[in-house]
Amino acid sequence: MTRSDLAAAFDDGPALVSYVVAGDPTPAATAEYIDALVDGGTDVIELGLPFSEPVAEGTTIQNAIKRALDAGMTPDAYLDLVARIDADVPVVCMTYYNLLFQYGDRAGPAAFVSAAAEAGVSGFVVPDLPVDESGPLREACRAHGLDLVFVVAPTTTADRRERMLDLTTGFVYVQGRVGTTGAREEVSAATPDALAALQHTDIPKAVGFGVSSGEQAREITASGADGVIVGSAYVDTVADGVADDDPPSVVADRLRDLAAELKAGAARGVPEPEHK
């Protein structure tokens, strides 16, 4: 598998997509955390590019973004970090369209997409990008062989959902609940119905928003998901380490253990094949 082959990350069973904020609390720490998450079983890294108005995020990730911005994280520093990642897994850039549009000396997303492709990014998740206005970013991604992952929410209409399924590449991001990101104690009751509405498509389906434990990961894959997306649980772990002044190596060990729990839980949700 090459780093640009995002869909292939789902080929060998349920995929674990792990989100962290680039530069929280430092770029060096983020690189160490990514290595730990991959060691723990992560199949795809969703690396957040900090933006000052993260409308889809809850308090946990908003605070992480502020820490990263206060520490000096910029789009160029983000690309430098991606280029230094050694892990042989796809890296997806999660950010907001304004950053992509304003990068470089001309309006439009093409300049950042080109730079991201050179750095090693495999695709994008842009939650504030309306599907009907996604043409320029889709064209830029297609030109560089990158995926553009659309987010299907519980409130997405059937017509718009089908449009997203036609255009998404790599996988489809299934928003497991209404609202913003943040760890929850229970899987939303709406998740099985959301997945059932997508079973007619072959594109891998990964559920995010609120996943924080191995048991939740099991429930989600048992409901038909091809993967789980986890963010706030990791970011909470990083925040606790920052608050306690723990060295990055200690935080990395905790992240590795959490990823291993989540990966194992996701695998338990899929029935083992029958042996004849």
From Swiss-Prot:
GO:BP terms for this protein?
Answer: L-tryptophan biosynthetic process
SUPFAM superfamilies tied to this protein:
Ribulose-phoshate binding barrel
Entry keywords, A to Z: Amino-acid biosynthesis, Aromatic amino acid biosynthesis, Lyase, Tryptophan biosynthesis
Q: Which reaction does it catalyse?
A: (1S,2R)-1-C-(indol-3-yl)glycerol 3-phosphate + L-serine = D-glyceraldehyde 3-phosphate + L-tryptophan + H2O
Q: Name one GO cellular component term.
A: cytosol
What the record says about family reads: Belongs to the TrpA family.
Q: What is this protein called?
A: Tryptophan synthase alpha chain
Its gene is trpA
